[in-house]
Amino acid sequence: MLKNDRLLRALQRDTVDRTPIWLMRQAGRYLPEYRAVRQHAGSFLKMAKTPELACEITLQPLHRFPLDAAILFSDILMIPDAMGLELHFIEGEGPRLGKPIRDAAAITQLAVPDMETELRYVMDAVRLIRKELDNSVPLIGFSGSPWTLACYMIEGGSSKEYAHIKAMAFNAPDVLHQLLNTVTNAVISYLAAQRAAGAQALQVFDTWGGILSPTMYRTFSLPYLTRIARELERGTGTERTPLVLFGKGNGPYIAELAMSGTEAVGVDWTIELEDAARRSNGQVALQGNLDPATLYGTPNNIAHEVQRTLDSYAAGNGGSREGHVFNLGHGMTPGMDPDHVSALVEAVQRLSRR
């Protein structure tokens, strides 16, 4: 039995003694101990593909901060890599895929990878982390969203214009839907395998959904997020594994996401939580949404923004703080001070206590 189940209870909108907190990219380059492991390992991919290293990095922030969850150390591009698109990282430029998808012929060659062969290292990491956590806090597994993965798979890496995928959306929408369906099948299998290996909550990162117009979002992102929420087997009752659908720029679609079948919606800092709570109408828990740049401020400024965020959620949720998981609106960045993270966690725990 979990010693700390605040996160799981909050994601189900159950009563908790205080608002739980975890942070996107809580294990990362802002931590000197992470940088030490990275230097010794020699590459990001070696860390992500070595279960013992992935476990060590996952646990690093838990040794520093009294967080309410661990999140698997991995990368959303492990699925495209397992599909044969040859993931590699270029220093200063980020991830690159050596075989980008540009036509229907390339899509027909893609297959959903076997989760216990091509992606066994991920499942082994999940199993090892669960063992090392020893039921102290829940472990969150994750995947990229179909749209976000398709962006990388078609562009071949990060992009400013997303010209290739947007051209496909306008000129060959059927081809893009073919790719999105294949990727959605892979995401569902990937999340199910993480759950079977021991993940106790799951999150989908729709990082690039916000680049789409409303019509395009409702065509190429939302339907596939909904498929995941409705088709991913997560159990029932108190044994149900909660799902969080997080998206940058998803504020206009919160009401629709709340009806998707997910347990929770993660939001960025470009919408007030009060507005997000009103739009979700009590159908889902909400996760977020402190501007990550707040961590560059003083501890007093951080505490002020924590209070404002907590109050904003309650104002849109009938005065109640139930159903809220505190998080950033996006991930930690390398220049952040671990002491300011300590100040953030302390402020959330102190100010949200019921």
From Swiss-Prot:
It holds the Pfam family URO-D. Its EC number is 4.1.1.37. It comes from the Bacteria. Keywords: Cytoplasm, Decarboxylase, Lyase, Porphyrin biosynthesis. Substrate binds at residues 25-29, 44, 75, 152, 207, 330. One of its GO terms (cellular component) is cytosol. InterPro entries: UROD/MetE-like_sf (IPR038071), Uroporphyrinogen_deCO2ase_HemE (IPR006361), Uroporphyrinogen_deCOase (IPR000257). It catalyses: uroporphyrinogen III + 4 H(+) = coproporphyrinogen III + 4 CO2. Gene3D superfamilies: 3.20.20.210. The keyword Cytoplasm applies. Belongs to the uroporphyrinogen decarboxylase family. Homodimer. Catalyzes the decarboxylation of four acetate groups of uroporphyrinogen-III to yield coproporphyrinogen-III. HAMAP family: URO_D. This is Uroporphyrinogen decarboxylase. It comes from Xylella fastidiosa (strain 9a5c). The lineage of its organism: Bacteria, Pseudomonadati, Pseudomonadota, Gammaproteobacteria, Lysobacterales. The gene is hemE.
